């Protein structure tokens, strides 16, 4: 199990990403636009750098919904490999079963 503080930190990051998503997207379009002047582009870069570091989506970490484990996460199921195997063995994941050949 992941520490409660780590789960809380990830939840806080998710809130920050949602809060600043539109602002970040607008600044990035200004930076990427060939029509914007160098001065506008530079101002947009400075404003983007002034935003909170955790408001970037790249800083979010996928975690298991049950345990909070950061490694071995399977996005399709939202679980770590360990919890997915346990759920599969109990028959809780429809259409998924242990391989046998």
UniProtKB/Swiss-Prot annotation:
SUPFAM superfamilies from the UniProt entry: Glucocorticoid receptor-like (DNA-binding domain)
Q: Name one GO molecular function term.
A: structural constituent of ribosome
**Assigned GO CC terms:** cytoplasm; small ribosomal subunit
Pfam families reported for this sequence = Ribosomal_S14
Instruction: Output one GO BP term.
Output: translation
Would the keyword tRNA-binding turn up in this protein's UniProt record?
A: no
Q: Which UniProt keywords apply?
A: Ribonucleoprotein, Ribosomal protein, RNA-binding, rRNA-binding
Domain of life of the native organism: Bacteria
**Which InterPro entries does the record associate with it?**
Ribosomal_uS14, Ribosomal_uS14_bac/plastid, Ribosomal_uS14_CS
Role noted for this protein: Binds 16S rRNA, required for the assembly of 30S particles and may also be responsible for determining the conformation of the 16S rRNA at the A site.
Provide the assembly information.
Answer: Part of the 30S ribosomal subunit. Contacts proteins S3 and S10.
- Record family assignment: Belongs to the universal ribosomal protein uS14 family.
The protein, known as:
Small ribosomal subunit protein uS14
């Amino acid at each position: 199990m992941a520490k409660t503080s780590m789960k809380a930190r990830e939840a806080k990051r998710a809130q920050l990403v949602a809060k600043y998503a539109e602002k970040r997207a607008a600044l990035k379009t200004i930076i990427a636009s060939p029509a914007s002047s160098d001065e506008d582009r530079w101002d947009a870069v400075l404003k983007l750098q002034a935003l909170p570091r955790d408001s970037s989506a790249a800083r979010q970490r996928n975690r298991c919904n049950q345990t909070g484990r950061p490694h071995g996460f399977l996005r399709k199921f939202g679980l770590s490999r360990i919890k997915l195997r346990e759920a599969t063995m109990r028959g809780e994941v429809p259409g998924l079963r242990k391989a046998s050949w």
